Amino acid sequence: MFFGAFWLLLLLLLPPLRPPGAQGHRGAKSPEQEADEPIPWPSIQRLREQLRTAGTLSKRYWALFSCTLWPDHCEDQETPVPPLGWSLPLWGRRSLDMLTSWFCRFQDCCSAGNCRISNNFTGLESDLRVRLHGQHLASKLVLEAVKGYLEMPQVGKALALSFHGWSGTGKNFVARMLVDNLYRDGMRSDCVKMFISTFHFPHPKYVDLYKEDLQRQMQETQRRCQQSTFVFDEAEKLHPGLLELLEPYLEPRSPETHGAELPRAIFLLLSNLGGSVINEVVLGLLKAGWSREEITLQHLEMPLQAEIIKSADSSFGSSRLLKKHLIDLFIPFLPLEYRHVRLCVRDAFLGQDLPYTEEALDEIAKMMTYVPEEEQLFSSQGCKSISQRINLVLP
């Protein structure tokens, strides 16, 4: 096949062939002289014409393909592809559409970024089941809420999920896992924005500047993307003015106010607020003979919301987001036990492609502090800082 393609290319590149005995080139001929000369090697000439036609057709397909993927660049072409005098056949258009669809699975094909949205719910379900430990409740609630929202034919508001639990229980981990399965570029996607309260909005005196910048980013992202995700870490430390800014983005809206279809948006609010009451409820249920997997949202929802509302250390509980019930779901992250920490240690070894022993897993898991003092049941740091502790046991 390679040699066949080579000879076809050679035929296209060779100068016009002459029959034996013909004179070499001695200068330009007039059109009358060229017309009087017999056409040499008729069969080869016909083959060359067919190949040139095929080449022109290939160029036309490529032009249509590139214009489909990058319409902005298509308009800038200085030399348009010469027409063949007939329209592109239906089978050619279908082939072009199939090729475009396949290409867009791997490459960014549009300036809007929407062709990089994957919504891989199968991958999300697998990641939550395999990589997240001790959070059967959060796994179920996150998957059901996000999948249900994105599969709705039309939406009337943004989806607002509030993650609550102690540090190291997996709130950030789940947020990143979610983004990685909804967007091919993960956290690098133009449709994803992450804000850390103490990093992006550290000084209360600059709150007006923060509000202006935050509003600009959210508006630009929603204008660019039909599906956007906004992550707010340490949400309990957000300034009241910034919480108020989120209100119109989370309120229900009718399609008439925004055109035919509302852009979909997911807001994730990550907070340590309510972690203590979650731990108290879980500890009480375990002492009463319940298994961890039997704990449901009904056990935790009311105590968690009550704790958030009465918290004096944060303006989150007194914000209009809660008063107007704009948060769709409060998702509790349970405290992690020794067995869960041990699984996190194993994953950390595997993630760094390091060999491990059962003794090494136990050694690192025992380095963590466990509470309450009497029961020593829950890791006070969850699975945080485990990767750094691996270095302490390496030879």
Curated annotation (Swiss-Prot):
Q: Where is the signal peptide?
A: 1-24
Report the Pfam families cross-referenced here.
Answer: TOR1A_C (PF21376), Torsin (PF06309)
Residues that, per the record, bind ATP: G165, W166, S167, G168, T169, G170, K171, N172
Q: Does this entry carry the keyword Manganese?
A: no
Give one GO molecular function term: ATP hydrolysis activity
Q: Which UniProt keywords apply?
A: ATP-binding, Cytoplasm, Endoplasmic reticulum, Glycoprotein, Nucleotide-binding, Signal
- Does the record's keyword annotation contain Calcium? no
Main localization category: cytoplasm
Q: Which family does it belong to?
A: Belongs to the ClpA/ClpB family. Torsin subfamily.
> What is the protein's name according to its record?
Torsin-3A
Q: Give the source species.
A: Rattus norvegicus (Rat)
